[in-house]
Design a protein with these regions (language model features):
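Signature for HUH/AEP ssDNA processing cores
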Residues: 2-130, 140, 194, 198, ...
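Catalytic core of tubulin tyrosine ligase-like
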Residues: 135
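DNA replication initiation modules
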Residues: 139-209
Length: 209
């Protein structure tokens, strides 16, 4: 059963000039930017006192999760503004329509991103504090026949979520390794990303399982 906090979670007004308020504004701007480029978003749970909480119900959550149903993911600017006015704590990108996500251990993902194939034709890539790399690729994507040999290679199911910078996970920042601006907000070629992963799979990075 979910635990509940005793006090209502407070939201810092967006007009405030405190560091916390500036961080919330940066999260709102990240959500608006993603939605403007056709990437569906959802607000996520808040990290507080070493736990995640749903800012609507005050219940603790099992990790960083959406606080509204996944099927409500949207690119509507008005809805995004409304959500991040009261639920500004995390930005979650939702897979299946605008992009798919291929996830691998971070060091392997970085090795692949540095490979000549992706240096010339990069894919947006997120790295998380849990040391995972998430490549955003065009839909529909299917896994290369060799990649399922490594258990931590994951092709996200539709309506999966991936945290977008500057969201925090366990109190630490999620970051772009390859920003979407570098690719004109175009997801990468899934075949090319996977060829780069296969090409770098023999190194130590791929054995980080």
């Amino acid at each position: 059963m979910s635990e509940r906090v005793s006090a209502r979670l407070r939201v810092t007004p967006c007009g405030s000039s405190t560091p916390a308020a500036r961080r919330l504004i940066s999260l709102r701007d990240a959500a608006l930017s993603a939605s403007q480029h056709g990437w569906p978003v959802l607000p996520g749970s808040v990290w507080r006192q070493s736990r995640y909480y749903n800012a609507i119900t005050n219940a603790s959550t099992n990790g960083l999760t959406p606080v509204v149903p996944r099927q409500h993911a949207t690119v509507d600017r008005q809805q995004v503004r409304a959500w991040w006015q009261t639920l500004p704590h995390a930005v979650l990108l939702v897979t299946g329509k605008a992009f798919d996500v291929i996830s691998v251990p971070m060091s392997w993902g970085i090795s692949a991103a540095k490979h000549s194939m992706l240096r010339h034709d990069p894919a947006p890539m997120i790295v998380t504090p849990e040391r995972m790399a998430h490549f955003l690729v065009t839909v529909p994507a299917t896994l290369h026949v060799e990649l399922p040999r490594w258990p931590r290679v994951v092709l996200a199911e539709p309506l999966s979520v991936v945290p977008a910078p500057p969201t925090r996970m366990d109190g630490n920042l999620v970051k772009w390794w390859i920003t979407p601006n570098r690719t004109d907000w175009t997801p990468g070629d899934p075949a090319l990303v996977q060829r780069a992963l296969v090409a770098t799979a023999s190194g130590n990075a791929a054995r980080e399982t």
